Each structure stands twice: as C-alpha cells, then as structure tokens.
Amino acid sequence: MRTLVLLSSVAILSTLAVKCKYDGKDLENNEVITVQNAFRIKCLTEDNGSWKTEIIGCVTPDGTEINAGEKKEVGDKVHECVKSESGQVSLKESKGRTAACPGGQKHGEQWQEKSFKFRCGDGGVVKFEACVGQDGSVIPAGETGKIGGFDVKCEQHANGTITMQAANDPKSYDCTAKDGSSKKNGEEYVEGNFVRKCGDYGQGKIIGCHAENVGNTIGINQNVTSGDIVYSCTKDGSNYSFKTYSLKAN
C-alpha cells in the first residue's frame, strides 16, 4: 500500500503541469518571451518537475530576432547576439556595409576636400581615392602622375597623413627660358629687362631687372643711376615693371 501511495504520488507529480518562473511570471514549457526589449528567453521543463529558463536569442530595436551566436545586417547596422561560455548573452551593434560616413555622405558617395578626393566605403569608413591638381588633373592614391608638367606622387601614409608632392628632388628640375634654353637650379638668366633665377620644381623667379648700361642686376624696388638715366625696377603685388627716367632738363 505504501508502495502504491508512493507510486501514486509519483504519478501525481509527473502529471502536474510544471511551469517556469521568471520575474514573477509563470511560463509554459517551450514558451518564449522577450525581456528588456532585447533578449528572448525560453522556458524548458522536465518530467521530474525541474525547469529552467534559457536565453536563446536577441531582439534588435526594430524587432528583428537573432539566434544566440548569430548576427544579422539590418539596414545600415549589423547586430550580433553574442553568447559567452558562461552563458552570458549580449547584443552588440556595429555599422553595416551601407552605413553613412561621419560627414553624412552616403555609402559609395564621392566628394572632394581641397586637393583630395574621398569615397564613403563599406561600414561608413572614409576611403582616400585620389589627389587633384589645380588644372583638374587626377592622380589615384598611391600612384605618380603629371600635374603642370611635373611628376607628382599622391600618397596616404601609415599614420593617415595624405601628401601630394614632387616625386623627384625639387632641385632636380631645370627651368626653360623663353628662348628654349635650359637652366639649372640656382642659375640666373636674363629675359628681356628682367633677371630670373631658376628655383625649385623648375620655376624661374624674377629677382631683379637688367639694363645694358648697368653692370649688375638692379634689385627689386631699387633705382640705379647711370649717366643721366635712372633705371627703376619695381614690384607691385604680383606685377613687375622696369622703367627709365632721364635726368636731363627738357
């Protein structure tokens, strides 16, 4: 009889509806609820009367369900439901492939800032594309091209700095005078009434004026008198002028 009672008791226990308890709520076996608007919890019961709740996934802000250990790209964001060995689950969010860049540019959009072109790449990452010369010449990143007749290298360095500079030594370029002759860096030469000096990148800069009756170069904004003639070499802004004045009375 005692045995039957025990059996009866076991039978009664096994037929009782076992439920999970979570935050003061009763949950049926296999019932799934969402908590904290971010996690999916499932009730699991056993015939022996034991039960447990298990986090089986996450829920994104827009309601998309993600199983634990998986990730999904929703719009311009990637949501990952991470489950650790200890059973802790966390919902992580990162930029998706089509995310916008920090400046608001859309995925794939190109734009120019001063002399540099950029593109909004995957994950909202700004990608350096090319250098642009004043004449509109474009040199792709990492390459060398010609701008204004000079070899220019367009480069992004490891620290993120972007440079557009002469590919060769600035002093290695020759200047070309109006008569077609070549002048070395540092060499002075006469063109009409002006004296030029060959500078870096092959740029001939006016350093003074020239007069047949004056032995030396007349400096900028200086006057030199030879006989009864005054020779004047002046600069006004970016304009240079050479003039002569007679000291003879009319």
From Swiss-Prot:
InterPro entries for this protein: Mig-18-like (IPR040282), Mig18_Fn1 (IPR055119)
Cleavable signal peptide: 1-17
Principal location class: secreted
Protein name from the UniProt record: Uncharacterized protein ZC412.3
Keywords: Glycoprotein, Secreted, Signal
GO cellular component, one term: extracellular region
Glycosylation sites: 48, 159, 223, 239
UniProt subcellular location: Secreted
PANTHER family assigned to the protein according to its UniProt record, in alphabetical order: PROTEIN CBG04538-RELATED (PTHR35572)
Keyword Glycoprotein found: yes
Pfam families according to UniProt: Fn1_2
